[in-house]
Amino acid sequence: MPYAILVVSALLYGLALNLPVGTMPLALLADGTAAPAVAIAMGSGMFAALFVSLPIGALTDRIGRLPMLRASAGLGILSLLGLGFAHGPVLGGILLGIRSIALVGYMTAEFAYAGEIASKERAVSGVATLGMIGNLTFAIAPAVSVFLWQHGIGREQYAWACGLAICGFALLFALPGKFDERRGRGTRAPILMHPRWYPAVGFALACTLQGGVNGSLAILTFHQRGIVNGAAIFTASAFTSFALRYPAGRLVDRFGPRAVAVPTALLSALGCVFAASAHSLLAVVFAGLLLGTSWAAVVPVALGLLFEHSSSRTRGAAMGAYTLAFSAGAATGATVATLATLAGGGYTIAMTLCAVGPLAVLPYVLRSRRSARVLRGLREVATPS
């Protein structure tokens, strides 16, 4: 029951908070904001997430999952309400940054709490499947927001959506405290980043590079190549990832993250290569299918590596490292896209570089060792009572 409550809360909250992704650029342009200023305002959320991921993870361990969940949900509602009335790139950028901080806090505490609900044998698939809700709301909400905008419903849609977010917020108070964990005062200093989390962070970052490049250049590049609907790469990837996330999580539960990391890295590299050379809609869709299959496993692989070296008392910090990895990967990918374009290689060179990333990090992941604590835990699970 707590897991179902968390899923419904995440669905309602995510649908509301992701509406501005689709129409805030249109709203800012309607205010007369120049295109570069719009890009900076929209990018403020990305950089806010980079700066706060680790501190929020440590704070989650300090105060507990439920307080962080509720505080983040409340902050997100306030930011959404503000976006319904704010005008101009400065105030809009600030509120988008606050929105991003709220989402990072919500997701960090949500995943840490869910990790305690699921059994040890299904911890990875349980948390990874919950992450599908975020992917689903990100796929649906911006498109719905644009549809509403096209039918004359502007910024007021954000204020109306606060109703959904408030419903999600209210559900959080139905979650039992027995799955919460906090360090409290008088304990050791909070952990921001443990060295044994580096393989998980590196792998997630390397596999997320392509997302930053595709978000920056894919549609424009495919349009220049004569492909009518280049956005098909995102559609194919999103639906494939959604369909395969739970099976991928169960594979990690069963065989461990390192065994699944090998085909994941290979599929990511192949997807990048096919996307770089795609000159037809069929090739674009095929590249999206490969990238979506890989992406379905990236999340559970990263979670599995993090769970190996984190306990209940450090799970918040581990999830902070998780959110940092994906935020940094997208930001780095966007930077790679910009540099490749300036160098004249554009999308082809950028995606080729992205293909190298997961393969380069893979040996580091395979060499990483489990902690003695986890090995003992696995032996206990394998020993019949």
Report residues per predicted region.
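Structural signature of the two symmetry-related core transmembrane helices
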Residues: P67-L81, A259-V273
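Intracellular juxtamembrane helix-capping segments at the cytosolic ends
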Residues: G105-A118, A297-S310
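Symmetry-related core transmembrane helices of the 12-TM Major Facilitator Superfamily/SLC fold
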Residues: Q157-F173, M351-L366
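Helix-loop boundary and gating motifs at the non-cytosolic
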Residues: M1-M46, P199, F203, T208-R225
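Helix-to-loop junctions at the C-terminal end of transmembrane segments
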Residues: V52-G64, W149, L244-G256
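Small-residue (Gly/Pro/Ala) motifs that create kinks and tight helix-helix packing interfaces
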Residues: P25, T137-W149, G333-T341
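Residue-level signature of mid-helix packing/kink "hotspots" within the transmembrane helices
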Residues: M46-L54, F138-A139, A238-Y246, A331
